[in-house]
């Protein structure tokens, strides 16, 4: 996977010589630029030096949007949950994010100091990749997202990340990725033995200040102590 070309990205360091990394994937039609603006809103403690990496998804035709070419982590073929995601595209994006993880490892960051985060489509990739990654990660954050292909998780999940901290947050009025889908994803994870920090907000398919601060608290907790692995 390390031979995969790295996606273009925006990086934001919160301090000198960051010893932790957060790889944060945007949603459909967006770029890493939009989410890079949230870093100051997270409220991270000054002593925590983190590199945030915001990759730009490749552009591709998106079926549900009449084939319009836009940044996407995978094709969306239908509006319903079961046939929504192009699993081959999800797998391809997993490979790309594994390459981003490898790049952070190559600069000396332990896997246990790396968090995968994402919004909507990006959250799908964060969950799909993080739960299958071979080394223990610091955490996974999924905002306004869902678990794709949950039936494969029991066989494909990495033993190293069976206890990885997970934060999921969702809007109660989300018209794009329905709240019930997120609840089903949380239930599937908890049934599989994962502990999920769950937040629900009175909003649609968007982010809120309270949600971003909850993410900041989660990152502060899972990255608080240096790990050796």
Regions found by a protein language model. Name each.
Residues 2-115:
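Serine-hydrolase catalytic machinery in alpha/beta-hydrolase-like enzymes
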Residues 19, 161-166, 192-194:
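Short, proline-enriched alpha-helix->beta-strand connector loops that line the catalytic pocket
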Residues 35-40, 154, 178-188:
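Short alpha-helix in the alpha/beta-hydrolase fold that links the catalytic acid
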Residues 44-47, 157-163:
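Short, conserved loop/helix-junction motifs that constitute active-site signature segments
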Residues 55-56, 117, 141-144, 169, ...:
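Alpha/beta-hydrolase-fold catalytic nucleophile elbow
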Residues 105, 110-161:
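Primarily recognizes the serine-hydrolase "nucleophile elbow" in alpha/beta-hydrolase
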Residues 167-170, 174:
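Short beta-strand/loop motif that positions the catalytic acidic residue
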Residues 180-229:
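C-terminal catalytic histidine-bearing segment of alpha/beta-hydrolase fold enzymes
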